[in-house]
Amino acid sequence: MPLESSSSMPLSFPSLLPSVPHNTNPSPPLMSYITSQEMKCILHWFANWSGPQRERFLEDLVAKAVPEKLQPLLDSLEQLSVSGADRPPSIFECQLHLWDQWFRGWAEQERNEFVRQLEFSEPDFVAKFYQAVAATAGKD
């Protein structure tokens, strides 16, 4: 109910917010605070990983992007080793374990958003990722 002045005329206040048409904002999809923090964490780790660690992450990312392809799975199995089972995991191995857990909990649009954020900070790495995914085409 509008406020009324003493002369019984309704008072109207201009909107303080600009009128924005719906669905014209190219911003990324909304995601939970927790998911956004997980992504920030992984991107921070990535910035500090060595070349071989980044290559290992690339293999895992490709395997996640093309899960039905057998070749990435076989390539990942080659990375497994039973030697050193008595030692505790390295920090990098713990980071990969968390990455795997978090990634599995993300929706497809959140996964795509992660790749978009990674591409913003590491375009060369993401270009290698796209090349590796394309290379899996036809390999069953």
UniProtKB/Swiss-Prot annotation:
InterPro entries: DUF4508
Subcellular location: Mitochondrion
A Pfam family matched in the record: DUF4508
Key words of the record: Mitochondrion
Superkingdom of the organism of origin: Eukaryota
Entry GO CC: cytosol; mitochondrion
Name this polypeptide is given: Uncharacterized protein C14orf119
Native source species: Homo sapiens
